[in-house]
Swiss-Prot record:
Disordered: annotated span: 37-80
GO MF annotations in UniProt: metal ion binding; pentraxin receptor activity; protein phosphatase binding; protein-containing complex binding
Domain called Pentraxin (PTX): residue spans: 286-488
Protein name: Neuronal pentraxin receptor
PANTHER family registered for this protein in UniProt: NEURONAL PENTRAXIN RECEPTOR, PENTRAXIN
Keyword Signal on entry: no
Residues that coordinate or bind Ca(2+) 2: 419, 421, 431
A GO CC term attached to the entry: extracellular space
Quaternary structure, from the entry: Interacts with KLHL2. Heteropentamer with NPTX1 and/or NPTX2. Also binds taipoxin-associated calcium-binding protein 49 (TCBP49/RCN2).
GO biological process entries: neuron projection development; neurotransmitter receptor localization to postsynaptic specialization membrane; regulation of postsynaptic specialization assembly; response to hydrogen peroxide
Function: May be involved in mediating uptake of synaptic material during synapse remodeling or in mediating the synaptic clustering of AMPA glutamate receptors at a subset of excitatory synapses.
Transmembrane regions: 3-23
Length: 494
C-alpha cells in the first residue's frame, strides 16, 4: 500500500509539474508582441525586466505554487520592491521569445545610398542623351553624303546614251565583241541599284537606331554603323568610277562600231543600186553571182540538189574576196549526217587556205587577198587520197594521203559562204566568207589540167555533171544577194 501511495504521489507531482510548465509557456506563444524591443536573447530580455534570467525562471516556477514576491537586497531603492513592468516570461525549458525588429541607423544609410544611386543614374542618363545627340548629328551628315552620292550616280546613269541603255541582243558579227559591253554595263547598273537599295534600307533603319541609342549604353553601335557606312560609300564610289570608265570605253567603241555599220550600209546600198541597174532576167542561166557583203553568221547560199556518193570530184568556182588580210573564210562546205566537215574549203585568220575531207586537212598554196576575181579548182580522188589545187588555170600544189580510200558520203548539204558545225547550220561568223562567188560547178571525176585552163580562160566552159551553176538550184538566205554577172564578158571587156 505504501508503494502504491508513493507511485500515486509521484504521478500527481509529475502531472502538476507538466501543467505548471504548460501554463508558464502559454504567454510566450500567445503574446510575442510583448517582447522587449531590441532584445535578441534571454539575458538581454531579463536585464531589461530588472531581474537576472535564472531568478526569473525560478520565480515563474514558484508562481504556480503561490510563493512570496521578489526579495529586496540591501541598498536597493525602494522602487525595486514594486513588480517590474510586464514583459515576456522566459523559459529555459521550452523556447526563447524573439523580439520584433526595430528600426536602426541602417535605414538612414540606405536613404543616403539611394540618393547617391539616383544622382549616378541622372548623370548616366545625361551622358546617354549627349551621346544620342552626337549620333543623331553624325547620322544626318551620313544621310546628306548618301543623298549626294545617289545624285551623282543618277547623273552618271542619265548621261549614258539611250542606244546603249536599250541595246538588245542582235545577230552575231565579227564586231560582236564590242557589243558585249552593254551587257557588262547592265550588270554594273544592277550592282549599283542593289547598293542604292541597301543604302535606302539603311536610311530607313537610321531613325529607329537613333531612338534606340538613347536607352542603349553601348557607344560601339555608332562606330560599327559608321564603319559600315564608310565601307558602303567606298564601294559606291568605286562603282561610279568603274561606270564612268565603262561609259568612256563604250563611247569610243560605239564610235568605231558606228563607222563599221555605215561602211556596211554603203556596201548594201551599192548592191541595191547594182540590182536596180542590172538585168531582171539571167541570160544565160549561169550568168549570176552570189554576194555576201559583210562577215556574219546568217548570210549564205544553199545549193538545192542532192550530192551522190563520190569516189572523186573536182570543184571549180570564181571568187572575189573582200575580207582583206583577215582570212578569206569559207567559200563552200559540204556536211553529211555524222560528219560536219565532209568537204570544206577554208582559210581562217592568218593560216593558209586548207582543204578538209572527212576532217583530214591539206594546206593549199592559194592566195585571194588582192580583192580581184580568181578562178579556183580543187580536184581529189579517194585512191591514195591524191589532190590538186589550181588558181587561174595554173597548178599551184598537189599531194596525197588526204582521206585516202574514203568515199564522199551522199545526201548532204552544200553551203556557199559559211562553215557548218552541224548539218546545215550552226555557222561561225569568224569563218564566214565575205565577197562574191560565181560559176560553182562540181564534177564526179578529176578534171585534166587542160580542162581547168580552158574554164579559167573562158575558152572551154564546162558545166558540172553533179552540181551545175544554175539560178534555179541556188537559193540565197539572210541578206545574201544574187545579181547578174558574166565573168567571161567581164574578162573580155578588160
Amino acid at each position: 500500500m505504501k508503494f502504491l501511495a508513493v507511485l500515486l504521489a509521484a504521478g500527481m507531482l509529475a502531472f502538476l509539474g507538466a501543467v505548471i510548465c504548460i501554463i508558464a509557456s502559454v504567454p510566450l506563444a500567445a503574446s510575442p508582441a510583448r517582447a522587449l524591443p531590441g532584445g535578441t536573447d534571454n539575458a538581454s530580455a531579463a536585464s531589461a525586466a530588472g531581474a537576472p534570467g535564472p531568478q526569473r525562471s525560478l520565480s515563474a516556477l514558484q508562481g504556480a505554487g503561490g510563493s512570496a514576491g521578489p526579495s529586496v537586497l540591501p541598498g536597493e531603492p525602494a522602487a525595486s520592491v514594486f513588480p517590474p513592468p510586464p514583459g515576456p516570461l522566459l523559459s529555459r525549458f521550452l523556447c526563447t521569445p524573439l523580439a520584433a525588429a526595430c528600426p536602426s541607423g541602417a535605414e538612414q544609410g540606405d536613404a543616403a545610398g539611394e540618393r547617391a544611386e539616383l544622382l549616378l543614374l541622372q548623370s548616366t542618363a545625361e551622358q546617354l542623351r549627349q551621346t544620342a545627340l552626337q549620333q543623331e548629328a553624325r547620322i544626318r551628315a551620313d544621310r546628306d553624303t548618301i543623298r549626294e552620292l545617289t545624285g551623282k550616280l543618277g547623273r552618271c546613269e542619265s548621261g549614258l546614251p539611250r542606244g546603249l541603255q536599250d541595246a538588245g541582243p542582235r545577230r552575231d558579227t565579227m564586231a560582236d565583241g564590242a557589243w558585249d559591253s552593254p551587257a557588262l554595263l547592265v550588270e554594273l547598273e544592277n550592282a549599283v541599284r542593289a547598293l542604292r537599295d541597301r543604302i535606302e534600307r539603311i536610311e530607313q533603319e537610321l531613325p529607329a537606331r537613333g531612338n534606340l541609342s538613347s536607352s542603349a549604353p553601348a557607344p560601339a553601335v555608332p562606330t560599327a554603323l559608321h564603319s559600315k557606312m564608310d565601307e558602303l560609300e567606298g564601294q559606291l564610289l568605286a562603282k561610279v568610277l568603274a561606270l564612268e570608265k565603262e561609259r568612256a570605253a563604250l563611247s569610243h567603241g560605239s564610235h568605231q562600231q558606228r563607222q563599221e555599220v555605215e561602211k556596211e550600209l554603203d556596201a548594201l546600198q551599192g548592191r541595191v543600186a547594182e540590182l536596180e541597174h542590172g538585168s531582171s532576167a539571167y541570160s544565160p542561166p549561169d550568168a549570176f553571182k552570189v554576194s555576201i557583203p559583210i562577215r556574219n553568221n546568217y548570210m549564205y547560199a544553199r545549193v538545192r540538189k542532192a550530192v551522190p556518193e563520190l569516189y572523186a570530184f573536182t570543184a571549180c568556182m570564181w571568187l572575189r574576196s573582200r575580207s582583206g588580210g583577215s582570212g578569206q573564210g569559207t567559200p563552200f562546205s559540204y556536211s553529211v549526217p555524222g560528219q560536219a566537215n565532209e568537204i570544206v574549203l577554208l582559210e581562217a585568220g592568218l593560216e593558209p587556205m586548207e582543204l578538209l575531207i572527212n576532217d583530214k586537212v591539206a594546206q593549199l598554196p592559194l592566195s585571194l587577198k588582192d580583192s580581184n576575181w580568181h578562178h579556183i579548182c580543187i580536184a581529189w580522188t579517194t585512191r591514195d587520197g591524191l589532190w590538186s589545187a589550181y588558181q587561174d588555170g595554173e597548178l599551184r600544189g598537189s599531194g596525197e594521203n588526204l582521206a585516202a580510200w574514203h568515199p564522199i558520203k551522199p545526201h548532204g548539204i552544200l553551203i556557199l559562204g559559211q562553215e557548218q558545225d552541224t548539218l546545215g547550220g550552226r555557222f561561225d561568223a569568224t569563218q564566214a566568207f565575205v565577197g562574191d562567188i560565181a560559176q560553182f560547178n562540181l564534177w564526179d571525176h578529176a578534171l585534166t589540167p587542160a580542162q581547168v585552163l580552158g574554164i579559167a580562160n573562158c575558152t572551154g566552159p564546162l558545166m558540172g555533171n553533179v552540181l551545175p551553176w544554175e539560178d534555179k538550184l541556188v537559193e540565197a538566205f539572210g541578206g545574201a544577194k544574187k545579181a547578174a554577172f558574166d565573168v567571161c564578158k567581164r574578162r573580155a571587156k578588160a
